[in-house]
Amino acid sequence: MGKGSKQITHSEWASGDSYSASAGAGGGKGGDNAPFKRLPFNFCSLSLQPFAHPVCTPSGTIFDLTNILPWIKKHGKNPVDGTPLKNSDLIKLNIAKNESGDYVDPVTYKVLTDNTHIVALRNTGNVFAWDTVERLNIKGKLWRDLVTDEEFGRKDIITLQDPQNIESRNLSSFNYLKEGESVPGQKEEESNVNASALGSSAKILKAKEAVAKARSERAQRADSSAVTKKADGSTTTSTQSKTASFQSGKPTPYNAAKYTTGMAAASFTSTGLTPHTSAELALLSDEEYMLKRGRVKQKGYARISTTSGDINLELQTEYAPKAVWNFIKLAKKGYYKDVTFHRNIKGFMIQGGDPSGTGRGGESIWGKYFNDEFEGPLKHDSRGTLSMANKGKNTNSSQFFIAYRALPHLNNKHTIFGHVIDDPTPSSTTLNNLETHPVNSSTNRPTPDIRITDVTIFVDPFEEFLNQKKAEEASGKNKKVDPTEEDRETQQEDDDQVTWTGKRVRGPGSTAAGGDAGSGVGKYLKAALANQTTQEEDEIVEFVDEEPEPEPMRKKFKSRGGFGDFSSWD
């Protein structure tokens, strides 16, 4: 303040110094005097938005998986406290919800709020209220997870939110905010990041951008097709009105088939059926609807935990939906737990997924073989490729393998359904440990065994897709409109494969889903040949073809011209 003046000058007001009442406008912007801003417990500590796929660090900081993976790839540290952080340190959280969609304690169903003391168990990832764990586990001396019944210790309890320690959720103390580092989710800052320099983790960002772009393009095509529909002549309008008269005014379900139930035709030709005058579309099951190639474009993410380290995987749902569905469903029901890798060849691949550990067992989630999926751009062109093992055409079950190098001779022989998203080069820790693991020279079996401790699914693309479709149907956004170009192609393809009775036509050498593989002309001959083949191949297990060695060049003998002297004749 000036001499003899009761007013604060401009320089004093703008000053960052804080001295009692003379604190300037910038006095509370940093340091110990920074204003307290609390982050809600259901928000990602990096994007500052509600999380969809929650994971936490051993210290209890919660992030969204799709945000923290690119950050770790670029910075290699915890954005909140600046400590070193790796992908393997992240713990997937399982938070229960009630019917209203609120996060609750899975035992007491008490709603978790910003004032609830919340903890998680390190070995299972289940989230509880502290009161529940203290009363039922600690005081009751029952050191087992109340949901999965797995044993845990006191050191496995991770505090996610403590109302008595408000500084742990204080935004003003977050390291990356104080240092002004880039935050994923802000478009203006993402534009300054070279996505190609992020390596394999940039695939997550590209996938999110591709999904958003595809949605906007579909919306634009739907709008343009609606305008074109209105501009068409009266002939098109009358034809569509006649077609619509056979169907009810209800919105068409998202899983409606391109053919009817056939009840109208059946009741017309049979007096034993109740008459039906409407042509109702048949409904596909959720599995049948989603397992069409190209239907679900979102990628899945999983982690295989082994005794030699963790392997993070990106699953290609768009090009191999059946293989991804099979892998995710088997992993979720614990099929791969304690399963060994029974074959490991250095410079070639490592194979596992057989619970018997012999290479002869294993079955798919359907209990039978499923067909190969070769359509698409995926090739065995790099180290870290994840593919299905088989013993011939359309004989995929539960066994899979991870390539140690490019294997072009396996293209169109084994279905590719994923890739290792960690550093796949020979310098990477886990793949290098697996490749250099000692094996039996005669059987190529690892000694000692390499065991799969667990397979964790971080992102289930089918579950996400189904929830989105059901939400759209509930909100009435799925009303029947003029089909887009993609829908027309799908409808044309289905019309070519389905008769007017709704029976699917099987192509040569293929079997319809859910059909009897032995039906049709020559089924007994095929069964006999199959039995003969089975007897001949009792010693053949599920295998991956090794690269054939090139045939040696034949020596060319230079023939002598003319006749000999007949000296070799008797």
Swiss-Prot record:
It catalyses: [protein]-peptidylproline (omega=180) = [protein]-peptidylproline (omega=0); S-ubiquitinyl-[E2 ubiquitin-conjugating enzyme]-L-cysteine + [acceptor protein]-L-lysine = [E2 ubiquitin-conjugating enzyme]-L-cysteine + N(6)-ubiquitinyl-[acceptor protein]-L-lysine. Keywords: Isomerase, Nucleus, Rotamase, Transferase, Ubl conjugation pathway. GO terms for molecular function: peptidyl-prolyl cis-trans isomerase activity; ubiquitin protein ligase activity. Residues 215-253, 428-449, 469-570 are annotated as: Disordered. Disulfide bonds: none annotated. GO terms for cellular component: catalytic step 2 spliceosome. One of its GO terms (biological process) is protein polyubiquitination. Coiled coil: none annotated. Residues 484-497, 535-550 have a biased composition (Acidic residues). InterPro entries: Cyclophilin-like_dom_sf, Cyclophilin-type_PPIase_CS, Cyclophilin-type_PPIase_dom, Cyclophilin_A-like, PPIL2_U-box_dom, Ubox_domain, Znf_RING/FYVE/PHD. Residues 234-248 have a biased composition (Low complexity). Residues 37-110 form the U-box domain. Its EC number is 2.3.2.27, 5.2.1.8. It comes from the Eukaryota. It is found in: Nucleus. Pfam families: Pro_isomerase. Residues 469-483 have a biased composition (Basic and acidic residues). May catalyze the cis-trans isomerization of proline imidic peptide bonds in oligopeptides thereby assisting the folding of proteins. May also function as a chaperone, playing a role in intracellular transport of proteins. May also have a protein ubiquitin ligase activity acting as an E3 ubiquitin protein ligase or as a ubiquitin-ubiquitin ligase promoting elongation of ubiquitin chains on proteins. This is Peptidyl-prolyl cis-trans isomerase-like 2. It comes from Aspergillus oryzae (strain ATCC 42149 / RIB 40) (Yellow koji mold).
